[in-house]
Amino acid sequence: MYTILLVGIGGFIGATLRYVFGGWIQNSFVNFPVGTLTINTIGSFFLGLIMYFSEYQGLFSDQTRIFLTIGILGAFTTLSTFGYESFRLLDDSKLMLMSINVVSTVLFSMMAVYLGKTVALGVSSYLLGGMK
C-alpha cells in the first residue's frame, strides 16, 4: 500500500511538472509539438540516469526508484500525447512534420537515456570510485 501511495504522489508531481513545463515550452511553437518532444527527452535522460545509478550502484532503494521512475517520470513523460499529436499532424496532412516528430522523439529519447547512463557512469567514477 505504501508503494502505491508513493507512485500516486510521484504521479501528481510528474503530471504537474509536465503540465507547467510542457505548456510553457509549447507556447512558443504552434505547428510542431516541441513541448511533448522536450518533456519526453528530459524524462528519458533522467530515467537513464536514475536506472543506471540504481542498477549499478544501488544508490536508490526499490521504493525510491519506483517513486522516481514510475511515479514522477511515468507521469512526466507521455507516450499517449506523443501518439495523439503525431496523429493530428498526419490528420492535418502534415506528413513531413509527423515523420520528423516520430523519428526525433524516438532518437532523442534513446540518445537521452544513453546520455543519462553516461553521466551516471561519469559521476559514479568521479565520486564513488566507478561502477561495480
Curated annotation (Swiss-Prot):
Positions of Na(+) binding: G74, T77
InterPro entries registered for this protein in UniProt: FluC (IPR003691)
Single GO molecular function: metal ion binding
Activity regulation (UniProt): Na(+) is not transported, but it plays an essential structural role and its presence is essential for fluoride channel function.
Cellular component per GO, a single term: plasma membrane
Functional note: Fluoride-specific ion channel. Important for reducing fluoride concentration in the cell, thus reducing its toxicity.
Protein name, per record: Fluoride-specific ion channel FluC 3
Organism: Methanosarcina barkeri (strain Fusaro / DSM 804)
Lineage: Archaea, Methanobacteriati, Methanobacteriota, Stenosarchaea group, Methanomicrobia
